[in-house]
Amino acid sequence: MSSERPVYPFAAIVGQEPLKLALLLNAINPQIGGLLIRGPKGTGKSTSVRALAGLLPEVSVVKGCYFNCSPSDPTNMCENCLATHRRDAKLPETHRRMRIVNLPIGATEDRVVGSLDIEQAIKLGIRALEPGILAEANQNVLYIDEVNLLPDHIVDMILDASASGWNTIEREGISIAHPSRFILVGTMNPEEGEL
């Protein structure tokens, strides 16, 4: 039995042609830069975004990499993958379909960017990082429902990562940069406030 909830099929969405076209174009060419969908409650914004998941292509990722690095592009690898690539030239890879990564409305800065893994620091005395949502979003779709309700500093961090394609985690004297290339899709209801 699957734990995933059923998703409404993209082809079953009636109307909303400009929205569907914009979603498809972003899936075809992620360098477009993302999409902001505005509309009143109940117009199918979230349903359309979630339905896109069934049409997303497969991507290659480095097996076991927390940051979903691409095994074939050294310019978009974390430090660990790049070091392994330089030594062995071939990274273990796996293939999977791109996913819709949801950003919760109450997400903290540490949850978005990444943080120090306190459990390992206390138990083992080592400084280990806990990857954030921007790591999970690499080579995926980052979906923000009600983006207009997010705190400005969280929006700024996401836009910085989206524009540069990189996220930097800086905590407790540790600094790690990793690729964070994603399709950014936000939805908002203008009745609840503007961006």
Predicted regions: what they are:
Residues 2-195:
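Conserved ASCE/P-loop NTPase catalytic core
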